[in-house]
């Protein structure tokens, strides 16, 4: 790896501020932040923190409830995995989708028709390493708003992350490509067991999450699921593989712990790790856990005090290369619409550059966002996703030839396969 490339990557890293928040004072007692009992829908809420910012900082850094962004949550335990996954979802509004299926004719007299699945369409999101499903919370709300509720959203905490638990703690760090793929497939098949009765699924993966998502698309199509498109967020194989030697250095610059949940939210915002305060308030509480107290080995014994990282990313180092090797080739080979969204002018590797020139995928570049672009600008990404979905599920309705009977005159309507079906 060249020194020029190494310096360019390091220069992109944010200048990390001190871990302690500016209002922290050793002489003042710290009140605990109690977590409310989880409701039947499985979404936990946090009470607003009583420890407020200084008089010079009026920004609210208190945690937000996931119920503000998702309609429901569930604990999913596929029999093929040792994990119980926390799944968040907002179902599509099927009545709205059915009424918006067609468009008026254009100047040429032709019209397009939206291909509709009577079971709706879901955007299925897989987060990156160290994140959680709630990183997609603001995006889920924006997709619902901008898509008039026609598209549902499903996100989850993958193995070793967020609220997902593993029966064998030794398997928490098994984040190999094959394991992530197996877990992802198991969740889909658990949530939508019958491919014929399943909604259409647009698969989206951020960073590490792109690996299982891209690999799952052809496997799900073989099983009969309809996959109209695959979306990859801010990861390019060539750049990712070249950056791996720097990952330990990047991780070592993070604080090892935080004094409180609010301290963690504040750090993520001021370090520019997450540039959207609202998103940080809902996602950060789920990527940290209470540190075990000196008198107890139970991490939940001190919920309002010192916080540590939920996921030991350094422990997953053996799997880093496996996430990204061959990603570009698999992405270009998927038999559905493809969308790559990058943060800033990220350089494409050779395969993606050739693929772009051949028109094999749609490329969108978002400005003024960081690596967590879905958190930094959820409204902008939601608009891109809705347009991508509509563009790739519309079909041209041709008028019948003059004097020829319509399609319903003989043998009923013409059958057209859904986009993404094989």
From Swiss-Prot:
Gene name of this polypeptide: PPE1
Region of interest (Disordered), residue spans: 1-27
Residues of the active site: 207, 234, 371
GO molecular function, one term: protein C-terminal methylesterase activity
E.C. number: 3.1.1.89
Transmembrane segments: none
Keywords recorded for this protein, A-Z: Hydrolase, Serine esterase
High-level lineage: Eukaryota, Fungi, Dikarya, Basidiomycota, Agaricomycotina
Similarity comment text for this entry: Belongs to the AB hydrolase superfamily.
Function: Demethylates proteins that have been reversibly carboxymethylated. Demethylates the phosphatase PP2A catalytic subunit.
Protein name listed in UniProt: Protein phosphatase methylesterase 1
Reactions the enzyme catalyzes: [phosphatase 2A protein]-C-terminal L-leucine methyl ester + H2O = [phosphatase 2A protein]-C-terminal L-leucine + methanol + H(+)
